[in-house]
UniProtKB/Swiss-Prot annotation:
Keywords, ordered alphabetically: ATP-binding, Nucleotide-binding, Transferase, Ubl conjugation pathway
Enzyme kind, highest EC tier: transferase
Catalyzed chemical reaction(s): S-ubiquitinyl-[E1 ubiquitin-activating enzyme]-L-cysteine + [E2 ubiquitin-conjugating enzyme]-L-cysteine = [E1 ubiquitin-activating enzyme]-L-cysteine + S-ubiquitinyl-[E2 ubiquitin-conjugating enzyme]-L-cysteine
Gene expressing this chain: UBC7
EC numbers on record: 2.3.2.23
PROSITE patterns documented for this protein: UBC_1, UBC_2
Gene3D superfamilies cross-referenced by the UniProt entry: Ubiquitin Conjugating Enzyme
SUPFAM superfamilies: UBC-like
Protein name: Ubiquitin-conjugating enzyme E2 7
Function field: Catalyzes the covalent attachment of ubiquitin to other proteins so as to signal them for selective protein degradation. Involved in the formation of multiubiquitin chains.
Domain UBC core: 6-166
UniProt-listed Pfam families: UQ_con (PF00179)
Annotated GO biological process: protein polyubiquitination; ubiquitin-dependent protein catabolic process
Catalytic residues as annotated in Swiss-Prot or TrEMBL: 92
Amino acid sequence: MATAPARRASSSRSSSEISRTTPSMGFQLGFVDDSNVFEWQVTIIGPPETLYDGGYFNAIMSFPQNYPNSPPTVRFTSEMWHPNVYPDGRVCISIHPPGDDPNGYELASERWTPVHTVESIVLSIISMLSSPNDESPANIEAAKDWREKQDEFKKKVRRAVRKSQEML
C-alpha cells in the first residue's frame, strides 16, 4: 500500500499532466470526479486517415495508488471494435506492468517504466488504433475480422464511429 506522501506525489504528477494536454494532440483529459484524481475521463479523437477518423471515443483511465511505479489501466466506455481492445473495453497495449511478457510478444524494455506519462500512454493507444497488432489480440473476433473479413471489420468500426458521434 502506498504511503500518504507517495499518494500525494502520484496525485501531483498526474494532476500536472492533465493541464498540459490539448485537443490538438488528438485527445482530451479531465477528471471523472474532481474529488478523485485517480480516475480520469479520456476522449480520444479518431486518428485522421484511419478507419476511426471522425470518432470521439471515451475511456476511463484508472491510476493505482503507487503510480507512476505501476501503470494505469484504460477502458473504453464507448463502443470500440479493435483487435487490441477486449470486448469489455479494456485496452491491451505493450506498456503493461514491468518484466517479461508471459506470451513472449514483447521485450521487457517495451513494457512499463515510470518515465511513461499519461500523454505517452494515450499516444500509444492512438497509435494502436492506427496499427492493430493481430499477433496477440485481446478481441479474437475483431482480430479474425481484421485478418479475414476486412469489409465486416470496416462496417463494425464505422458503426462504432457513428455511435461515438451521436454521443456528443
